[in-house]
Amino acid sequence: MVDDRTALVVVDAANVVGSRPDGWWRDRAGAARRLLAELSALAQQPDGPAEVVVVLEGAAKAAVTGEANPEFRGLHVVSAKGSGDDAIVEVVAAAAEEDGDRPITVVTADRGLRDRVEALGAHTIGPRRLLDGIDS
């Protein structure tokens, strides 16, 4: 997925979950929890990224309670107060301002979001690349 141990990876959970035709629409919170568990395992691998931020929106926010989620080690879960895309842009902008040299990768297939975060210096990959890393 990302080869740099200093990297920040920001995941558009709604977009990634929506890319799998596995019935996610029947239980958005459950689908988000499954993705969080998979990402947690990936984040804890020795060659995983330094930091993984997962942005949840809408009904998927019920996948977590509060800020502390010990079952999802290695992840920072952000529950978007409004638009998930806006929350992702805020995370990327803050990270770029804090350390302009840190590699930032956003996982999404949303063309509008890709344009917004690339303008801030982030690299983007599609959900399939992330899911291939999870499934391997």
Regions found by a protein language model. Name each.
Residues 2-11, 17-136:
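Nuclease catalytic cores that cleave nucleic-acid phosphodiester bonds
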